[in-house]
Amino acid sequence: MPSTGTVRAIHVAPEQGAPTERVDRVRAVAGCGLEGDRYYRADGTFADREGSDVTLIESEALAGVERDYEIDLEPGVHRRNLTTEGIALNHLVDVQFRIGEVVCEGVELCEPCSSLESHLAENGIREALVHRGGLRARILEGATVATGDRVERI
């Protein structure tokens, strides 16, 4: 069970339904989310759900979806904020972890929903992402997150 990894990509969507935008760095604000993202302004599909400050997905999971289901997800279309590599996100539910200087706590798995399925219009995407759709987390201590930052359990 890998307990350290790296941020490989950062995406924010300025409003619900808008395409995600890739950024090199973003400010994470405790209890709010990532500046410039729909959830920061409480505008996302799950804005009323506890622990939707930031979402993460493993690059390894995306590679598995492509391998097992022949679905190639372009960067950011999965609508998760941070793409990581080298850390088992499913093991971070109810665990505090650090992304660079940001302290987070895993809240729940980010299982695929009908909203993602309809947004992508890709047959089988919901099934393909079950148990590998990533992690929802709350931000406990804010700071700037940048591509290349280390992700580690505390």
Feature locations, PLM:
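Metal-cofactor-dependent catalytic cores
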Residues: 1-154
